[in-house]
């Protein structure tokens, strides 16, 4: 279960003695749970200050996570202590909504313990350290929530602590999987470039003499520490990186329960994923035949990749899509838009361009100063060859342009952000299930086209373009289906063990992706084991919609369904099912 960006917790919580060990009676359950929730998040952000920054709690900006082995030990002890405190509450004594929040919070704690005690990424993933500390600085840079001098001073304080983190990494890392060390080595030069170029550029306007003088000391020290870390990984860690990245079936199943509240047996889950893959492949073949019966799917995709706006028209193309999607959402009563304020559409800032093509940057739930959301689009760089420009722009083809704008903005992530003030609790604002967040955005890609968007006069210029838009949506769906299947098979062996090479080939032959995408997705899947959550969430939402439709009958309204879903926050779909259907029926 996702809590705003998480690193490593450290420190101990302190609660009144009468709440720490005694079983809480029914009469005091609601009050006690409310109190404990506040205490938990106070401690959580003290131990995860980067997450505090992302949430908009800037009292944590000058602090950094404790990555030491002792810090990990304190985190584990803290989480067990919190698990014990929460277990003293009888959830049956709580009303329906707080009872659901109780389970969300308890599962989140257990998910963190599973990662620390069983998966043990802190002993296995060297990139968690180098990218983790980089993320701590990026979280201060990415939004102008405070004057540049204030944010530079925060960067200096965090940078002072980074070299020690990279020393802690050397002590903690035992026997990483070779692929993890290879990924960390692939990343390290970009991280060095980030501190060499992007961080100074972001604070070029600072005029606090002392902060600038301090930064002139801390930033080179971080660069040197990262270079040293990279050299150590290459000469020392890589030759002894012989570990296993696989979760195993038991850990994978537990992670699904704790993160997503899904307890479907893995063999059935795999069958569901394969069925969706085959359904989308059949639909892809049907649409491709309608475009040109003489071409193979691969030939159709090669043509699709060439149909995109000119680079200097890309931002305007997204602006036009937003307007078109907003008009369609309103005229077809897809969902209530809580605000007419649109995200700020802009070119991706330089320090983000290496890692994203298009992204939605929304403020944290407690941000009070920089409250705008930014939709960032990465344009080709000056000096690129025509071939590289063409490769980059293929990601913004006529199909992907629609899928991306729907997924990231209307009615995907941005609209969910607009509903955030209506989320029923702090827990729903801070802890989210990926099957909800990414499942909703992926569901929207299909739902909008099913409802008629992307047809001539509604997002497409003609019937051929409408088919190309659907083809792009289906290719994106097949990518998510391939993740679903590869994740299960690589990590559990259910359905037959899958090697990394076999996973790459699966993405190419069954997911209709390029080899480069297949390699990238396979690498991601070695550490993001549960990246099935896109398709899993979409399928859960589709089933929920059908079940609500059956229950409401003639009174069913798609807009009302979507509004009701959004107002529940980013909770696991199981929680939302119970709120909307008042039963414990299966999510799939």
Regions found by a protein language model. Name each.
Residues 22-588:
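N-terminal maturation segment of proteins
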